[in-house]
Amino acid sequence: MHNPILLTAICAVVSFFIGAIPFGLILGRMFNHTDIRKAGSGNIGTTNALRVAGPKVAALTLLLDCLKGAICVLIARPLIASVGYGFPVSIMAPGAAGDWMLGVVCLAAVWGHIFSPYLNFHGGKGIAVGLGVILAWYWPIGLSLLGMFIVAVAITKYVSVGSLAAAIGLPIAACAVFPYSSLGLKFCMAMIGITVVWAHRANIKKLTCGKESKLSFTKRVTEPDDK
């Protein structure tokens, strides 16, 4: 198949469905016989898994959500480059001809997590899967955003603040590190950041009202948060 655009579209669709796998929900049911959507924030991500199902489920959710994002990129990069172009993976590097194609795959995996077709197009907020795709795409940016997240959470005790900082920082970092990358790649990185911020709209409202829950490794919740 020497059609890189078609192959990119196929990889994006596959990445969307891989990204959509709701590991937080699956693990909560497996280990705690709990539907984590029915307590806390109702989210299927790591933070709500921690609040509802505990550290074990949260750690596994974080790991698997990161891995599913990374796997999408690690598979798509050589596949699109070698099969679609007939060139080495350097064709997918930022600034090269095919850089935007990997950006599409990254975006598709994050959108799959946030708009999961397995859950009527409801899902998580995209932080863990986003970390996975960015680490696989260009790990120095991934690590810098992770550091930004950790510092913000350590200072404020709000996971949502760290998540928003990382989401806003992604397109800025991508443009700063790779100013000569394609507009397509920049657009994809910007859309990841914008979508993750949008997914945190309820958290933003709670932060402004002083109702956002702070990070706790010991406190469990069994009821939905007040809206």
Residues of each region from the PLM?
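Helix-coil boundary and interhelical linker segments in multi-pass alpha-helical membrane proteins
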Residues: M1-I10, L74-V104, L135-I141, A176-C188
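Interfacial segments of multi-pass membrane proteins
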Residues: L50-G54, A76-I80, A108, K125-T156, ...
